[in-house]
Amino acid sequence: MASTRSIELEHFEERDKRPRPGSRRGAPSSSGGSSSSGPKGNGLIPSPAHSAHCSFYRTRTLQALSSEKKAKKARFYRNGDRYFKGLVFAISSDRFRSFDALLMELTRSLSDNVNLPQGVRTIYTIDGSRKVTSLDELLEGESYVCASNEPFRKVDYTKNINPNWSVNIKGGTARALAAPSSVKSEVKESKDFIKPKLVTVIRSGVKPRKAVRILLNKKTAHSFEQVLTDITEAIKLDSGVVKRLCTLDGKQVTCLQDFFGDDDVFIACGPEKFRYAQDDFVLDHSECRVLKSSYSRSSAVKYSGSKSPGPSRRSKSPASVKRGGHHASAYSAARSPVNGTPSSQLSTPKSTKSSSSSPTSPGSFRGLKQISAHGRSSSNVNGGPELARCLSPEGVNGNRCSESSTLLEKYKIGKVIGDGNFAVVKECMDRSTGKEFALKIIDKAKCCGKEHLIENEVSILRRVKHPNIIMLVEEMETATELFLVMELVKGGDLFDAITSSTKYTERDGSAMVYNLANALRYLHGLSIVHRDIKPENLLVCEYPDGTKSLKLGDFGLATVVEGPLYTVCGTPTYVAPEIIAETGYGLKVDIWAAGVITYILLCGFPPFRSENNLQEDLFDQILAGKLEFPAPYWDNITDSAKELISQMLQVNVEARCTAGEILSHPWVSDDASQENNMQAEVTGKLKQHFNNALPKQNSTTTGVSVIMNTALDKEGQIFCSKHCQDSSRPGMELTSPVPPSASAEEPPVSAPAAAPAPLESPTPPGTPAASGCERAGTWRRHRD
């Protein structure tokens, strides 16, 4: 500011010293005197606008100014990703003040746990000849490649630049350039189904529910993704963006044409893990009455083709109805007590799919044709003829699939025990040994464009084999589906082990921590970080001799650590401070989550929580790392346990202990824990603070839900951090201190559940027999 003023003063001093040769316009010049021509001769000082210094600004026309402000459009690709079609960014000085700001935005848009896990750090030209180091080097209409710290990978990135919007277009840049008119006509024909239509979208959650009316026509419905964006802006879900739309019959909307069918009312759900309750698809009498009056008023303009450019018009009615309202649903769920949604868990909602998939739904798996999903229908619960046809030796289109034939020969396939967004789980029994497993069937057509996420998860499962980790027994593949034979754990999760037992001591908690630390030491030895350690992913395995152990599952967010990671993901209650701070993190984020779990095991509530259910408050507490052991809940807990928790919950990553140090700590290894029964106290607090700690009717469903999840279900858990959270951007919603409803798998019941009898689950291969000191009902401590 001071330099600017000094320049202005120097300018005026120069004007005083050197008068302009000409006087005011229309005044005659004087040959001999300077009294009339000089600026001071007539006592007038010319305006700065007339000075030579300001003549520069007069030459900059409005056209020049507008061209300077105009945004440059450029397309960005991921380094080495030949299946990514690129993302177009509008780059302007107003949007990006610096080159680092552009890198940060590209990281949020292009980075995930497989591609660019360390964020975007380098931008190459499309041919890799040079690096881009400033915003001025980016040119209008050019393409660039984003990388972390790795060298440029030479791939023909522009090969798949034109997406196949129509199933009749075979794609390819060459054909698009050769016959643009034909492609354009085909695209136009594919949208002939679009007619002006007024639809009602109801937000999921507790009643009364907000509803909005949206006009769909050729001006407002360009693509399915664009309509979802408009619905997100209109309905404003508490949990962020709208990820899923269903009709009142429970059928999922998968493409743009589904909006123009017989259905007029849709249910909108966000990225939270949510299983639909039966009454979510049923409108009460007041909602039907309000909707009827609303539609009677709007029927005259329903097909008039409004000229308003806006995509939606809000309705003050709480809900809407569909054709008089006959809706049936067989879905059941446990809904979070806060706003009716399990907000903290950020997985894609679990919905039961319709038995017939939409014929207009686009889908391909690396060029393979899509076929209808098998085994989804409720009439085929035993996996009979349909599964046999799916796994028949003839395969698909007459091609033999020896893998599927081998699968049927080796295993007896039973009924469906779990149905998720991208996978279905069936009972599976080894014909030779009689051991029970879970068969996870992933539909490749539903993973189109995101196959790398599934491949990453499966590649990690192939590598790990440990008694405290749910094991991938076998994998097989056909042209349309991926089959994973998984270890089936029937004992429920960590909370079930506490709430369903008659006695729970500090020693039991110590054994649970030992099991978890044992699994983490193994994973970290392979440089694998789990990133989603929480009680819902820790399943209880009960052995024939009555002993128990924990098994870690759900590797959807797991990845191999080759350097600092920057993807902000996880579950708020268990997320480490370095993830929130976005300073880069590694293996020890799992240790922090284990420390939070250890704290909960001994008192029943988390160490960091927001009394006002605000995510910002929770993150501030985690970043501060102020750990307290309030009385009277911690009065009877040993100092050794408190010491270990303090070492695990160190904000300083270097000071935080490792998994090996946890195993060697006296509280874990030397039986420094007490035998006092604290089952009633801990169970009471768990039921108060965690909705998934309520007793379940069937503990097997907990293990099935963990197996049913895929890496694609985890996309919603990559969230906006504390630094980028605002009211207009979807972020991670918090239910504090209630963590995620990992378990909205079973509806809560009021009657207390009896302690389950030990299950005759088979002992996994390689599991050592229980030592003599491990009596029935105690926890096993597997020694590596």
Swiss-Prot record:
Where does this protein hold ATP? Answer: 417-425, 440
Q: Looking at the record, which segments are called Disordered? A: 1-45, 300-368, 724-784
Q: Which Pfam families match?
A: DCX, Pkinase
Record note on quaternary structure: Binds to and stabilizes microtubules. Interacts with MAPK8IP1/JIP-1, MAPK8IP2/JIP-2, MAPK9/JNK2, PPP1R9B/NEURABIN-2 and actin.
Q: Which reaction does it catalyse?
A: L-seryl-[protein] + ATP = O-phospho-L-seryl-[protein] + ADP + H(+); L-threonyl-[protein] + ATP = O-phospho-L-threonyl-[protein] + ADP + H(+)
Q: Which SUPFAM superfamilies match?
A: Doublecortin (DC) (SSF89837), Protein kinase-like (PK-like) (SSF56112)
What is the name of the gene encoding this protein?
DCLK2
What cellular-component terms does GO give this entry? cytoplasm; cytoskeleton
PANTHER family according to UniProt: SERINE/THREONINE-PROTEIN KINASE (PTHR24347)
Q: Where is the composition biased (Low complexity)?
A: 24-39, 300-312, 341-364, 741-758
| Name by which UniProt lists this protein | Serine/threonine-protein kinase DCLK2
Give all residue intervals belonging to the Protein kinase domain: 411-668
Which GO MF terms are attached to this record?
ATP binding; protein serine kinase activity; protein serine/threonine kinase activity
Q: According to its UniProt record, which residues of this chain constitute the active site? A: 532 (proton acceptor)
Q: Look up the domain of life of the source.
A: Eukaryota
As recorded in UniProt, its EC number(s) are: 2.7.11.1
